[in-house]
Structures are given as structure tokens and as C-alpha cells.
């Protein structure tokens, strides 16, 4: 395997005052827990869709290390550990996934088959975003650092032809920030990278608080102008899309103003455009992207779409007890999360209220994703849990399937739900012909209990493909 220079691993944790934590315990053989998700190497392939044409095919890739495929969310809810799949201009693929020795980037052919040994970014923590190049990749991740909190720093790492070309740290002592987690996104417009991620104040005006940061980096690893050092408060969810010119389009879930906001080029100040109000507090938001990293899809006419799990807002008003005048109090509309799709007129302006694709009160909806599907349709995916039992903002329930549905750019259904056996566990890559591909662990989900202890592991990934 090709490896980066080893770095000393640091203890990782989620934000302070937050129940959400990564599972970083022993990565020995799969831990069998009551209600755990079990690796099922012999899982059957997804059935063909007779009416919608949404047929998911799978290729199995063997891994050289154990992949801990679960993470604990708020209240230790079960979440997929993020993988990132990206397509290079020549059509080949890269898949990034974490292991005990660092972040592995697996090279694949256009057909989704392994084409070589993994590149291992030694000591790196967390897949924060991935860009595939013909000669390698760029990875947003966390690496060890020296700071007052003894936390990791955000870093953009570029590999060319199996060797590290640069490693640019994006937080540090001079900027008074660290990155104990990223929940990030990475974009590339052919000239520069845009990295959007969570930061922890380490000195200065924001000492001890959590916010977010947008940083631009050149193709050679030099920091560029633009972006911001402190934006959305306690960012609870990030979406980013690269643009050929100007600021990259971005969204964030903010706990203080309680909801989803446009942060494009402005870092989400008090007057940031509101996409949706949600009940949020430090470490939690009733509206959420899958794993707190969402997708932004752009239409040919310049509109945008994003999808998220939402509890909605029965009421929303400024908090009279907040002397800053910035805080909001939101009462959620539902106990369970429903599937919402929101649209923007352009990179700065929301287009009306979100459209809800589900409305069943007793069913919880998680792991919501959206991707382009052809010229004028969107693929929305989610997982459903029946007989939901909810407390303190999160729910458990009985898993009933992964749903695929096509909608148009007005949110109107173009197909009924199609329940498939594949899962979506991270970033989706769009291929040159419009087909979609992603990586996921071959496991049977269970959401009936919270996740405690270390994550179970697998040594295989499924590479799913959905033809356009």
C-alpha cells in the first residue's frame, strides 16, 4: 500500500456539551451488540424495478483493513460511518473510508472494480470530503496538531501518482481554531478547492465555542483569499457546491438561530436567508443532513436543491431571553423526522417553503440524500423506521427499507417509492453518463436500540451503481 508519512493520532471527540460522539473504541473483530448491525457478506443484490426502472447493481470490493461502519449520533442514534465516492475526469473512481491506521483511498475502475492498492493517509481521522483526479485525489481530513485543546487540525491532503504532493493545515494557533471533528465538504472547480467544515475556537473572541469555516486552497496547496474564519454557530450540518466563479454555494444548520440557512460567501450572519426553521440546540438540530453533510444539486437553469430529514416548525419566534437578539425558539411540528426537499432560486436565495415527500407521523425517516438524475429529475433516497419511539429529539424503530423516489424540480413525484436492498452511506458520485455510484457496507440495518460500545467492522464494501 502507498502510505503518507505517519502522524501521531490524537484523541477524538465530538463537540463539548454534545451527546453525539464518534465510536472510536477497539477496532478488533466485529463487536456483537444487542441490536447491532451485522456485516452480511452474502446479502442479496437489489431486485430490478419493474415499474420505475430504478435498478441498483452492486460490485463487491475486498478491503485490506477493517472498516468500522457505524458511528453514534446524538443520543447515540445509529448512523453510517461516512464513505466518500468520487469520479475522476477520466471516469475512474476513488473511495475514501476510515480504518484504525488512517484514511484509506481505494482506486476503482470505471466499472467499480479495484484497480490497485489503497493509498493510506496515515494517522488521518475522518473523511471530510474527497475529490478524484486522474493522477490521484485530494482529501479533506483531520491530522494531529499542537494546541491548547490537544485536538486535531483540519487539513487538505493532495496525492499525485501515489505520493503526497502537499498537506495544507486549515486551522491552527494563528487563526485561533482547531478541528476536533469536520462534518465537512470539499469542492473543486478545476482551479481551486473549497473546504467547508466545523471549527472549535482556541483563543480569541470565540475561545471554547464551535462555529464553521470556509477555506479556499489553490491546486498547489496555497491558501487563497475568500471564505471566512467563523460563520454558522455550532454548525449542525453542511452542504457545499463548487462554482466556476465566485463564492462556492453553501448551506448550514445553525443552533442559535435555529434552522437551515444560506451561507454562500457570507458565513451566515444574522440576516442570512432562511431555508427552514427547525428546533436546534448545541449539538442537535431537528433538521439534519445524513451524517451532518448534505448535497446541493444544481439545475441547468441555475436553481439548486437539497434534501434533509425535518421535524418542521409549528411555531418560530425570536427568543426574548436572548440579549444578543440572535436566538430563536422553534417548536417542532412533528416528533418524527420527515423527508424534506428545499430549493434555491440561485446560490443566494431560497425559493419558497420546502416540499415534504413523507407525512406518516409514526414513521421515522433517516439518512436522506439527493442527487441529479438526468436533465430534469432528482433522485431522493431515505431509510424508514416504523413504530417509531421518540425521546429528546431522536427516534428508534424497526427498519423497513431504503427508499428511492424520482421528483422534478418542483418537488412533484415522477415515480412511486422503490424499496431497494442497497444503502447509501456517504457521498454519491455522478458519472459522465449521468449514472450514480456510491460505496456502502454490506450490512442489514437495525435501528431498534441506541449504539453503545465500539462499532462492528467489515472487510468488504459494496459499490452500487444506478444507471440513468
Regions found by a protein language model. Give the residues of each.
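C-terminal region of N-terminal signal peptides and the immediate post-cleavage residues
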Residues: 14-18, 34-50
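Short linear sequence motifs
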Residues: 30-31, 297
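N-terminal export and membrane-targeting signals
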Residues: 8-29
